[in-house]
Amino acid sequence: KTHMHSNINMENQKSKIKENMSNITNKVVIMSGKGGVGKSTLSVNLAYGLSMRGYKVGILDADLHGPNIPIMLGVEGEKLTDLSVPYKINENLCTTSLSFFLPSTDPIIWRGPQKMGAIMEILENVVWGKLDYLIIDLPPGTGDETLTIAQNVGVGTKAIVVTTPQDVAL
């Protein structure tokens, strides 16, 4: 019975995620093979550029270990009480990050299921509304967060892979 209940909850969650993603015209994941190559910088600059052109843009900070988007947007330390409402930066730009809901700036030390659960909760509960673009800033590599996003955000998602010319970054 528990297994069946678990499957029903998962199907409900996936249905809600699909519904949330259906109002977003373009989904773009920003990824890399290693850290420190400029993913978050590109995510913020791309989002700002699109929003300045009049597009409605959201940034999802999916890097649970190093959530830099709030820092780069100048909203570090802001605390939200409602997971479903993204933080409004300006008329056309909003963001959400797990760091808005954590009690401190201590690093997160979570195993795969905890990370996947947090990502799924964000995807399920954040109500972006109608967006032209959702920019998803991923952590480095192809770990649990990246796989969870890839499996749940939907068909037609575009990817930008950021790298530097060093062998270790390729």
Put a short name on every predicted segment:
Residues 125-128, 132-133, 139-170:
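Conserved catalytic-core segment of NTP-binding enzymes
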Residues 27, 31, 53, 72-76, ...:
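Conserved, well-folded catalytic cores of nucleic-acid-processing
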Residues 44-47, 51, 70, 116, ...:
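Predominant activation on well-ordered alpha-helical scaffold segments within soluble catalytic domains
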Residues 1-37, 78:
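Extreme N-terminal, non-catalytic leader segments
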Residues 27-64:
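Walker A/P-loop phosphate-binding motif and the immediately C-terminal alpha-helix
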Residues 35, 62-64, 100-101, 140-141, ...:
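Short, ordered loop/turn segments at secondary-structure junctions
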Residues 56-58, 62-109, 116-121:
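Phosphate-binding loop that captures ATP/GTP phosphates
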